Amino acid sequence: MTIQKINRVLLSVYDKTGLITLAQELKDMGVELVSTGGTLRHLQTHGIPVYSVEEVTGFPEILSGRVKTLHPKIHGGILAKNRENEELSSLDIKTFDLVIVNLYPFEQVMQKAEATEEEVMENIDIGGPTMIRAAAKNWYRVGVCVDPTDYEVLTQQLKQYHGLTDEFRKTLARKAFKHTAQYDKAIFNYFESVDTNKDDETELKFPEFNLLESRELPYGENPHQKASLLMESQKFIQHQGKGLSYNNFQDIDAAIKLVHEFQKPAVVAVKHTNPCGVGVSNTIEEAYDKAYQGDPVSIFGGIVACNRPVTEELASKLTEIFLDVIIAPEFEPRALEKLKSKSGTKVVEMDLEKMVGNKVEIKSTTFGYLCQEADYHHPHPQNWDRVAGEQAKPEEIDDLIIAEKIVKHVKSNAIVVVKEGQSLGIGAGQMNRVGASRIALENAGKESQNSVLASDAFFPFNDVVKLCSQYGVSAIVQPGGSKRDQDSIDLAQETGITMYFTGIRHFKH
């Protein structure tokens, strides 16, 4: 283990969390501090002895502070391989042993709706990333710290060794390069979003990520599997309950993508990423009643997502059974008080508009990463082809639209039965279509009379239509495209069932 002693430190930070405590420790150890700009003033205000960069360089800040640290006496002191160097001595350059820098808040400023282009440009840090990269490149002699959460370990090492171990310096260098890479990626994303001269890109490209946070999860789908969540930033507020699990995140993702499909108040219940109950109505309370009654057995212990704020009245209903997670764009204060009685339930608030928007889906396989456009196709009844039966009534069309929206989010082979804005039966993940239909219709039972049915893919045989006639289904929507389509069309016509072809398949694996 190699220890590099710390005698001289350069500090320049935007985020001043923990700075004074750290600087005080450095001062007490007799370390020389050099700083600039707001960091310098902050340290001086707290009575900590510090040299200014101007005193070191003999050159003032210029261009309203745009150029402060870009000077050989700063970067020579960071990049020098050895402390004793004739070239440095001849130029009166002293080395730095530790660089503590974090950057202008470019991404936060960029995301402000009111931010001007000039304000965004001024928050592109130049000197900071240059110092960070220089120190990280020279990690075998120089420490670099970009994250205030590392100050505690940094202080511990300084107290123990009056320096930093090579292992710790290398870890800090890795974090530093990650920090500057993410920073540059955020800047690229900004220019990408405002560039009006880009060529039209029809080719689907693997998305580029700016993953700022890594959250360790208790385990994966099962307790023997390790897991973590990588995300750009946390976009939700958890009001109560234990931390969200790997399975929770998958189920929440499935639930919010479906509930976001509806303009009217809607509630979606999900189990193992499949919807088990969906309700659409004029009020969020009525929508929940429909979702619950659609499958009162499966909803127990599930995930419930709402596309409207949770009211006190709805909260009272939600506390009648055990739910693992409740998601909504907002919770009324009294609703949160009601939900506290279910301490085991995780209550999560999120902006659905911001959460649902990924245009690309990615799956890891043994061959590599599969990348595809997300299925955001919305039903357009005016484009459907009526191939059997009479024109559906307006209320049947409404239900067909709801069923078509739901079936897109169900694992294939998928069948959904709907009546009056309520899912009555959902057949998910079956190896044959008639099996999925039988599950959905049996769950619907007697309520299937005058219901509608949606399928995520065509009927290879007319057996699904035969089942529909036995259960009293009045209308069917499916993609069509089977070699035996005519068999299904003929049976639908014969049994008085209206059937539409959409030409759009919705497989989900």
Swiss-Prot record:
GO terms for biological process: 'de novo' IMP biosynthetic process. InterPro entries: AICAR_Tfase_dup_dom_sf, Cytidine_deaminase-like, MGS-like_dom, MGS-like_dom_sf, PurH-like. It comes from the Bacteria. CDD domains: IMPCH. Residues 1-146 form the MGS-like domain. Gene3D superfamilies: 3.40.140.20, Methylglyoxal synthase-like domain. GO terms for cellular component: cytosol. NCBIfam families: PRK00881.1, purH. Belongs to the PurH family. This is Bifunctional purine biosynthesis protein PurH. It comes from Natranaerobius thermophilus (strain ATCC BAA-1301 / DSM 18059 / JW/NM-WN-LF). The lineage of its organism: Bacteria, Bacillati, Bacillota, Clostridia, Natranaerobiales. The gene is purH.
